[in-house]
Amino acid sequence: MEVGMIPRVYLGHEWFGAERILSEYQVPEDCGAQVLFLGIPRNAPEDGGNIEALEYEAYPEMAIKEMEKIRQETIEKFGVKEVFIHHRLGLVKIGEPSFLVLAVGGHREETFKACRYAVDETKKRVPIWKKEIFKEGKGEWVLGEKKNASGQTK
C-alpha cells in the first residue's frame, strides 16, 4: 500500500522522511490526530559515549511480512485510519532517523496508543539486527534490546 510513491510499510536504505510523508498523505476529514515517532541513534554516556553509527541488517521478506502484520493489527486493535512503519537498513549515523511510525486516527488517545503499540511490536517482533559502530572503527552486534540503569528499553 502506498501514498503516492511512499509505502505504508518500508524497509530499506532510502529514507523518505517524516516531512515528505506528512506533506503527501491526505489526512481523512474525520481524523483529528497524527502521532509520529522517530527513532534516532544516539551516543549516550551509559553506552560508553563511543558510538559513531548503527548498522542495521534484516531478513527483508520476513521483516516486511511481520511489519505489515503489525500495521494491520494496529489499525484493527485501536481503530485508527492509517499507520506507516518505516525502518532504515545500512549505516545510520548518530542523530539521523532510523525508524518511523506514524499513526493517524480520529482522536489523540487511541492514536497515541496505536503509535506506541506499533513501535513496541516492531522492536519485539521484526527481525532487524543492529551493530554499534565505534569511533575507532570496530563494530559490535547488539543482542536483544538493551536496557538502561533504570530498566527502560533503549
From Swiss-Prot:
Swiss-Prot/TrEMBL catalytic activity: 2 [molybdopterin-synthase sulfur-carrier protein]-C-terminal-Gly-aminoethanethioate + cyclic pyranopterin phosphate + H2O = molybdopterin + 2 [molybdopterin-synthase sulfur-carrier protein]-C-terminal Gly-Gly + 2 H(+)
Pfam families (UniProt xref): MoaE (PF02391)
EC class (word): transferase
Entry EC number(s): 2.8.1.12
Entry GO CC: cytosol
Keyword Transport: no
Keywords: Molybdenum cofactor biosynthesis, Transferase
Membrane-spanning ranges: none
GO molecular function: molybdopterin synthase activity
Residues annotated to bind substrate: I40, P41, R42, H107, R108, K123, K130, K131, E132
InterPro entries per record: MoaE_sf (IPR036563), Mopterin_biosynth_MoaE (IPR003448)
Keyword Transferase: yes
Gene3D superfamilies: Molybdopterin biosynthesis MoaE subunit (3.90.1170.40)
Top-level taxon of origin: Bacteria
Subunit relationships: Heterotetramer of 2 MoaD subunits and 2 MoaE subunits. Also stable as homodimer. The enzyme changes between these two forms during catalysis.
Family: Belongs to the MoaE family.
Protein function: Converts molybdopterin precursor Z into molybdopterin. This requires the incorporation of two sulfur atoms into precursor Z to generate a dithiolene group. The sulfur is provided by MoaD.
Record's protein name: Molybdopterin synthase catalytic subunit
Source lineage: Bacteria, Pseudomonadati, Aquificota, Aquificia, Aquificales
Gene assigned in the entry: moaE
